[in-house]
Amino acid sequence: MKNKLPPFIEIYRALIATPSISATEEALDQSNADLITLLADWFKDLGFNVEVQPVPGTRNKFNMLASIGQGAGGLLLAGHTDTVPFDDGRWTRDPFTLTEHDGKLYGLGTADMKGFFAFILDALRDIDVTKLKKPLYILATADEETSMAGARYFAETTALRPDCAIIGEPTSLQPVRAHKGHISNAIRIQGQSGHSSDPARGVNAIELMHDAIGHILQLRDNLKERYHYEAFTVPYPTLNLGHIHGGDASNRICACCELHMDIRPLPGMTLNELNGLLNDALAPVIERWPGRLTVDELHPPIPGYECPPNHQLVEVVEKLLGAKTEVVNYCTEAPFIQTLCPTLVLGPGSINQAHQPDEYLETRFIKPTRELIIQVIHHFCWH
């Protein structure tokens, strides 16, 4: 029942007070089970059917799908339940206590993006869900901040095919219809150590890596020449060499060298295509030094994403907001949800607050976000 639902600010406060940090380091990583239980209970109180889905390969992480209404199509509102870790020394407030000051709501996850669920729940007070002509789905995912395992697994396993979806990441209520992807790899070269006084008796991994880097930089130039998407501020795929390490002493032939690099592909470029281009670029080194060079993923890859600019979802949201859709360089779960239905990224708060100490969401977003959620539910589930 709606009267069992706490006030908006108390929902928000409870979400922020429930830690759900995602981290690759096991000591920092936390289950989101308590947060999922909170959300599940609230949506059940509103009459939703709730399914909780364990996410394989994670440390006790879960997705939640709340659904109401019958038939095909409908609207999916999605978001992630986890946050990044926090630097205790840089926060001036308790990250897990929602505090309001000077028109801002402070706390870990206020903008990115636990708050979106508080907005959805509050908006549902003013909607008679018994009169929906199409179903409404609420998806809460796990591990977005690390592997995006929750959204990946949900997209792979669900039979759900809504008419459209909105992911409530902090976009300052500016609709986003496309973003680049992200691929990160480790290039590892195994040489053969030896005394530096006799270089011919070893294989210097740093020298081989120097050769490999030359070919990788040629690939970077080729990507810039071949692929363009003018709507992006950087309108081509970027390739960055981010970290390198090799050797242990000046008088030893280097036996191992490791390079970490990333590529941010444009929408429409497939991961197989990019991996093929990288393998082709490194082929001369591999042929010359068989068995000495390997390429390994550092993190699961994220493809680029694009919602067709002429889709009804884009037209409706642009009309409701009086704003054109944008493209951005950061990544979200949209590529995975987009495999189910056309998807936009749109939510309250600024992306500039994501992953920052003293994270906050400005209270000026409260009223327009609530109104927008009501409007999109009316449009896609009542008509």
Curated annotation (Swiss-Prot):
GO terms for biological process, alphabetical: L-arginine biosynthetic process
EC number, UniProt record: 3.5.1.16
Domain of life the protein comes from: Bacteria
Disulfide partners: none
Binding-site residues for Zn(2+) 2, renumbered to this chain: D112, E145, H355
Record's GO cellular component terms: cytoplasm
Cellular localisation: Cytoplasm
Residues annotated to bind Zn(2+) 1: H80, D112, E169
Cofactor(s) the record lists: Zn(2+); Co(2+); glutathione
Gene Ontology MF annotations: acetylornithine deacetylase activity; zinc ion binding
Transmembrane segments: none
Role played: Catalyzes the hydrolysis of the amide bond of N(2)-acetylated L-amino acids. Cleaves the acetyl group from N-acetyl-L-ornithine to form L-ornithine, an intermediate in L-arginine biosynthesis pathway, and a branchpoint in the synthesis of polyamines.
Designated name of the protein: Acetylornithine deacetylase
Originating species: Shigella boydii serotype 4 (strain Sb227)
Protein's gene: argE
